[in-house]
């Protein structure tokens, strides 16, 4: 299937790359279908709305820069995804790339949870103060590398 994107032009995606968010994302509730594919810069993922070619997001696997990341989500909240095993789950954090060149951040407080078997997804808001909506990806990756070298 070919889709139009605002920044990357025409892209070809397969059915397994499409996710459905029944409730949409926070602030974007009317957009339900997105295609996931590699972004220009690795390790980022491009998340393109299939409902509006002008709407897209960048996401990242949070475990790449925060291996200690833990999801504190009530199983009842995840029931609409029909998850039968933890191995069926993909987790993404939405990324903010400010136009002024300031820190690229990831939202670890509102992860995107995807059932990779049925491609159902939802964004979940986690309470508590351990995870924030703006984690500096570059700084945290550098900190992780420094810890690994010790």
Swiss-Prot record:
Q: Return the similarity comment.
A: Belongs to the FliW family.
Its subcellular locations are: Cytoplasm
The protein's matches in Gene3D superfamilies, at most eight in alphabetical order, are given as: BH3618-like
Q: Which GO terms describe its cellular component?
A: cytoplasm
NCBIfam families linked to this entry: PRK13285.2-3 (NF009800)
Disulfide linkages recorded for this protein, renumbered to the chain, are: none
Q: Which UniProt keywords apply?
A: Bacterial flagellum biogenesis, Chaperone, Cytoplasm, Translation regulation
Give me the gene this protein comes from.
fliW
Quick one: where is this thing mainly located?
cytoplasm
Instruction: Report what the protein is called.
Output: Flagellar assembly factor FliW
Q: Which domain of life is it from?
A: Bacteria
Q: Which GO terms describe its biological process?
A: bacterial-type flagellum assembly; regulation of translation
Q: Please list which residues make up the signal peptide.
A: none
| Assembly description | Interacts with translational regulator CsrA. Interacts with flagellins FlaB1, FlaB2 and FlaB3.
PANTHER family reported for this sequence: FLAGELLAR ASSEMBLY FACTOR FLIW
What does this gene product do? Acts as an anti-CsrA protein, binds CsrA and prevents it from repressing translation of its target genes, one of which is flagellin. Binds to flagellin and participates in the assembly of the flagellum.
